Amino acid sequence: MRLFLLSFTFLMSISCSDDQPECIEDQITIFQETQADCLGATVKKYRFQGMTLYGFSDGQCISDGGTSLFDEECNNFCFVGGIAALTECNGVNFFENAEELETIWVAN
Protein backbone atom coordinates (compact mmCIF):
# COMPACT_ATOMS: atom_id res chain seq x y z
CA MET A 1 0.00 0.00 0.00
CA ARG A 2 2.82 2.38 0.87
CA LEU A 3 4.49 1.79 -2.51
CA PHE A 4 1.18 2.48 -4.24
CA LEU A 5 0.81 5.79 -2.41
CA LEU A 6 4.37 6.80 -3.25
CA SER A 7 3.84 5.91 -6.90
CA PHE A 8 0.52 7.76 -6.99
CA THR A 9 2.07 10.82 -5.36
CA PHE A 10 4.92 10.77 -7.87
CA LEU A 11 2.56 10.54 -10.84
CA MET A 12 0.43 13.36 -9.49
CA SER A 13 3.51 15.55 -9.13
CA ILE A 14 4.58 15.26 -12.77
CA SER A 15 4.53 18.82 -13.97
CA CYS A 16 6.52 21.28 -16.03
CA SER A 17 10.20 20.66 -15.86
CA ASP A 18 12.52 23.63 -15.71
CA ASP A 19 13.66 23.24 -19.31
CA GLN A 20 10.34 24.31 -20.89
CA PRO A 21 10.01 27.81 -22.34
CA GLU A 22 8.12 30.16 -20.02
CA CYS A 23 5.19 30.57 -22.39
CA ILE A 24 4.82 26.76 -22.59
CA GLU A 25 4.94 26.53 -18.79
CA ASP A 26 2.13 29.11 -18.66
CA GLN A 27 0.08 27.12 -21.17
CA ILE A 28 0.68 23.92 -19.21
CA THR A 29 -0.56 25.57 -16.02
CA ILE A 30 -3.76 26.72 -17.73
CA PHE A 31 -4.22 23.31 -19.38
CA GLN A 32 -3.79 21.56 -16.02
CA GLU A 33 -6.45 23.77 -14.47
CA THR A 34 -8.98 23.07 -17.23
CA GLN A 35 -8.16 19.40 -17.89
CA ALA A 36 -7.27 18.09 -14.42
CA ASP A 37 -10.40 15.93 -14.17
CA CYS A 38 -10.33 14.76 -17.79
CA LEU A 39 -8.98 11.22 -17.90
CA GLY A 40 -6.47 10.86 -20.73
CA ALA A 41 -5.47 14.52 -20.95
CA THR A 42 -1.71 14.85 -21.44
CA VAL A 43 1.07 17.25 -22.31
CA LYS A 44 3.92 15.65 -24.23
CA LYS A 45 7.14 16.89 -25.74
CA TYR A 46 8.03 15.81 -29.29
CA ARG A 47 10.85 16.16 -31.81
CA PHE A 48 9.36 16.76 -35.26
CA GLN A 49 11.12 17.97 -38.41
CA GLY A 50 14.05 19.19 -36.32
CA MET A 51 11.84 21.21 -33.98
CA THR A 52 10.67 20.72 -30.42
CA LEU A 53 6.88 20.68 -30.19
CA TYR A 54 4.57 20.44 -27.21
CA GLY A 55 1.37 18.43 -27.63
CA PHE A 56 -1.67 19.25 -25.52
CA SER A 57 -4.05 16.30 -25.82
CA ASP A 58 -7.63 16.67 -24.65
CA GLY A 59 -8.92 14.01 -22.33
CA GLN A 60 -12.30 12.29 -22.27
CA CYS A 61 -14.07 15.54 -21.35
CA ILE A 62 -13.84 16.59 -25.01
CA SER A 63 -15.61 14.00 -27.15
CA ASP A 64 -13.90 15.01 -30.39
CA GLY A 65 -10.68 16.19 -28.80
CA GLY A 66 -7.31 15.87 -30.39
CA THR A 67 -3.81 17.19 -29.88
CA SER A 68 -2.85 20.83 -30.36
CA LEU A 69 0.85 21.16 -31.12
CA PHE A 70 2.81 24.30 -30.23
CA ASP A 71 6.40 25.27 -31.00
CA GLU A 72 8.83 26.67 -28.42
CA GLU A 73 7.55 30.20 -29.02
CA CYS A 74 3.99 29.04 -28.29
CA ASN A 75 2.86 29.37 -31.89
CA ASN A 76 0.08 26.93 -32.75
CA PHE A 77 1.92 24.66 -35.17
CA CYS A 78 -0.82 22.18 -36.09
CA PHE A 79 -3.68 20.04 -34.80
CA VAL A 80 -3.88 16.26 -35.10
CA GLY A 81 -6.48 13.71 -34.10
CA GLY A 82 -9.95 14.90 -33.25
CA ILE A 83 -13.21 13.74 -34.76
CA ALA A 84 -11.71 13.97 -38.26
CA ALA A 85 -8.72 11.82 -37.19
CA LEU A 86 -6.28 14.30 -38.73
CA THR A 87 -2.74 12.98 -39.12
CA GLU A 88 -1.07 15.54 -41.39
CA CYS A 89 1.13 18.20 -39.85
CA ASN A 90 3.31 20.47 -41.97
CA GLY A 91 2.81 18.23 -45.01
CA VAL A 92 3.57 14.83 -43.46
CA ASN A 93 1.99 12.28 -41.15
CA PHE A 94 2.79 13.53 -37.67
CA PHE A 95 2.38 10.16 -35.96
CA GLU A 96 4.79 8.43 -38.36
CA ASN A 97 7.43 11.16 -38.19
CA ALA A 98 7.37 12.53 -34.65
CA GLU A 99 9.54 11.23 -31.84
CA GLU A 100 7.97 11.42 -28.40
CA LEU A 101 10.62 12.79 -26.03
CA GLU A 102 8.77 12.87 -22.73
CA THR A 103 5.44 13.02 -21.00
CA ILE A 104 5.34 16.28 -19.10
CA TRP A 105 1.91 15.95 -17.46
CA VAL A 106 -0.91 13.42 -17.21
CA ALA A 107 -4.38 14.11 -15.78
CA ASN A 108 -5.35 11.95 -12.83
Question: Model segments located where?
Answer:
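Short acidic, Pro/Gly- and aromatic-enriched capping/linker segments at domain boundaries
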Residues: 27-47, 57-66
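Short linear motifs in exposed loops
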Residues: 56-57, 80-81
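C-terminal partner/receptor-binding element of secreted or periplasmic proteins
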Residues: 81-108
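C-terminal motif of bacterial Sec signal peptides marking the signal peptidase cleavage site
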Residues: 12-15
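Bacterial signal peptide processing site
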Residues: 17-19
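A short, surface-exposed beta-strand/turn
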Residues: 63-79
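Positively charged n-region of N-terminal signal peptides that target proteins for export
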Residues: 1-4
